[in-house]
């Protein structure tokens, strides 16, 4: 594959994956058309991103102990996983794949793959910030907190992974955690935590909107309110049916998140995603002296509490209940997100006036982003397998642009491609 073969490229989806892929393709000299069925960038999963720019703090959802969490989710009202006792055969099959990835060795491998993509993404974000004067309200440092000694002990067993990956981290007791985050509620049980000084957080939506202007200046064409209904591949390249009309490109990148499989399945391309609902709450800070200093991860609930400018963003929950595919906020999710914020920062914000977001996300069973070629010529993918951070998505986009252009990526992409499932 040479870059010359793929000069005119369509990218489907104007979320974080799509717009970053478009940027790096345009930077390499490609003519890029970004096609989006909504009226603007970041209208779906990217809108609900946690804001974490994390390499150390981003963990695969398939972690040791997942099977127990799935079982307990059927009986606990405030479980981070929302699951119905009645499962479809397809969802049950996906859950089995998800649980298989929670074995320690698989977790170690997936964590390594996610970390290398995120570390690369962090470097690229700094370059983009300097080159284009992007301001995405960045903050430094992430603290992961554990409510019980058992949770802390379980996490400590995984410390070797952090050491092997040469990730800067500190194991903290409760007093040290409160020194870093002095506004944590003193009445909520706290056993200890991890501090990841090189991780951080930022406003993903701000970043995407600024990237939109940047790629437009680079010549990327946007087609909003346009729906791709079919994909084909032939000798002339990739043929996209857009609102009933055929359009020919040298290649296409499917970066449509939860809508990707619908386009890929007719080509016989099988990607092991399931569609989940993800949730976020945003509350305006009323008492800055009681607010988080930076980004906090509640290990028990797999939930991020992130201060971005004058707001607190609480994101988490994995809703795998059938029938909850529309943008409907689950009452249980609303209650749990606000409970977590109130547990740790009760006086920081007007939680009773919080705004909520709910949207579909594509979940991969293992966690690392999925990029690269497919068995169908001229058809590439970029699917973010996790919604709890965005550094890895940026790194994966740059690596994908290199693959499409016939260049050697800066990171090992063997574990980020479709072949990892075969």
Show where each model-derived region lies.
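Glycine-rich FAD pyrophosphate-binding loop
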Residues: 27-47
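Helical element adjacent to the flavin cofactor pocket in flavoenzyme catalytic cores
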Residues: 153-165, 188-238
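Glycine-rich phosphate/pyrophosphate-binding beta-alpha loops
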Residues: 58, 199, 302, 320-322, ...
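C-terminal catalytic lobe of FAD-dependent flavoproteins
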Residues: 169, 342-422
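Active-site substrate-recognition segment that forms the wall
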Residues: 49-52, 57, 61-100, 230-238, ...
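N-terminal Rossmann-like FAD-binding beta1-loop-alpha1 element of flavoenzymes
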Residues: 8-34
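Dinucleotide-binding Rossmann-like beta1-alpha1 core, especially the glycine-rich loop
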Residues: 48-174
């Amino acid at each position: 594959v040479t870059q010359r073969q793929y000069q005119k490229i369509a990218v489907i989806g104007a979320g974080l994956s799509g717009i970053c892929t478009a940027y790096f393709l345009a930077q390499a000299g490609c003519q890029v058309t970004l096609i989006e069925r909504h009226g603007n960038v970041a209208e779906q999963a990217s809108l609900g991103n946690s804001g974490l720019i994390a390499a150390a703090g981003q963990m695969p959802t398939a972690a040791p102990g997942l099977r127990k969490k799935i079982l307990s989710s059927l009986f606990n009202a405030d479980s981070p996983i929302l699951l119905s006792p009645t499962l479809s055969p397809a969802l049950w099959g996906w859950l089995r794949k998800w649980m298989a990835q929670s074995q320690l060795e698989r977790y170690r491998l997936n964590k390594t793959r996610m970390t290398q993509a995120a570390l690369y993404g962090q470097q690229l974000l700094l370059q983009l910030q300097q080159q284009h004067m992007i301001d995405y309200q960045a903050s430094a440092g992430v603290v992961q907190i554990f409510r019980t000694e058992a949770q802390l002990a379980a996490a400590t067993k995984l410390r070797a992974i952090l050491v092997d990956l040469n990730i800067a981290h500190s194991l903290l007791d409760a007093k040290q955690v409160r020194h870093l985050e002095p506004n944590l509620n003193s009445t909520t049980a706290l056993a200890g935590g991890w501090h990841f000084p090189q991780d951080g957080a930022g406003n993903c939506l701000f970043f995407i909107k600024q990237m939109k202007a940047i790629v437009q200046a680079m010549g990327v064409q946007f087609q909003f309110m346009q729906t791709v209904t079919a994909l084909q591949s032939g000798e002339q390249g990739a043929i996209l049916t857009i609102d009933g009309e055929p359009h020919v490109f040298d290649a296409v990148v499917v970066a449509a998140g939860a809508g990707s499989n619908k386009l890929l399945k007719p080509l016989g391309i099988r990607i092991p995603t399931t569609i989940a609902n993800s949730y976020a709450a945003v509350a305006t800070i009323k008492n800055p002296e009681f607010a988080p200093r930076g980004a906090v991860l509640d290990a028990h609930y797999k939930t991020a509490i992130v201060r971005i400018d004058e707001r607190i963003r609480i994101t988490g929950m994995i809703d795998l209940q059938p029938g909850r595919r529309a943008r409907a906020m689950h009452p249980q999710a609303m209650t749990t997100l606000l409970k977590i914020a109130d547990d740790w920062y009760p006086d920081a914000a007007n939680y009773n006036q919080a705004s909520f977001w709910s949207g579909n996300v594509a979940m991969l069973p293992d966690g690392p982003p999925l990029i690269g070629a497919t068995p169908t010529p001229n058809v590439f993918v970029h699917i973010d397998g996790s919604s709890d951070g965005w550094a890895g998505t940026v790194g994966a986009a740059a690596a994908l642009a290199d693959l499409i252009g016939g260049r050697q990526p800066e990171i090992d992409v063997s574990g980020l491609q479709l072949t990892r499932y075969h």
